[in-house]
């Protein structure tokens, strides 16, 4: 009896489990044998590797009437899914006294700078919310990547608008002028006094 094992196979990660299962089942059927009397080919089978990565080692055996069983071993491997790397936006600070529209635009553009790599079928989301008030405030945003082969990855970044400087109003000192000046003089002094605020 001669037995021919399947070639060792390596499949890429990020396929569906159904795809891996089908390829594994098809791979099992590629084992062959020749010779022997009433030979029967079996395999230890088992489950296909996880689609996120792993190896199944299979023993193929031919039993026949006139010889001891013949065996061979082959492996079916799924490469490990690439690790998710989440890149958070840098914390951002904007000055106050811009329009709310301008702050909203900058906030949305900032949200879009988050990125990720790796993983299988990853989706990037964020807790978003509203931009800070253009007069001052901070919005803290959680960014999350969910994927098929890892627990969710998260990071947090902040977008801040610096609080406006409080207004300090300095009134002119109360003024008293003597009578009997011309109206032009009084008008001039009054206007000058207004300008001291």
Which residues fall in each region the model found?
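Proline-threonine-serine-rich low-complexity tracts
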Residues: 1-197
């Amino acid at each position: 009896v001669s037995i021919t094992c399947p070639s060792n196979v390596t499949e890429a990660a990020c396929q569906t489990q159904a795809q891996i299962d089908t390829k594994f089942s098809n791979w099992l059927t590629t084992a062959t044998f020749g010779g022997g009397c009433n030979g029967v080919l079996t395999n230890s089978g088992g489950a296909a590797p996880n689609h996120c990565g792993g190896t199944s080692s299979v023993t193929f055996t031919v039993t026949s009437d006139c010889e001891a069983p013949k065996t061979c071993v082959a492996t079916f491997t799924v490469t490990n899914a690439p690790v998710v790397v989440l890149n958070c936006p840098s914390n951002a600070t904007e000055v106050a006294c811009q329009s709310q529209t301008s702050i909203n635009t900058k906030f949305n553009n900032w949200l879009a700078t988050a990125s990720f790599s790796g993983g299988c079928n990853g989706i990037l989301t964020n807790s978003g919310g509203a931009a800070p008030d253009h007069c001052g405030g901070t919005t803290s945003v959680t960014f999350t990547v969910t994927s098929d082969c890892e627990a969710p990855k998260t990071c947090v970044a902040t977008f801040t608008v610096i609080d406006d400087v409080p207004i300090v109003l300095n009134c002119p000192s109360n003024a008293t002028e003597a009578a009997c000046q011309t109206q032009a003089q009084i008008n001039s002094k009054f206007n000058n006094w207004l300008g001291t605020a």
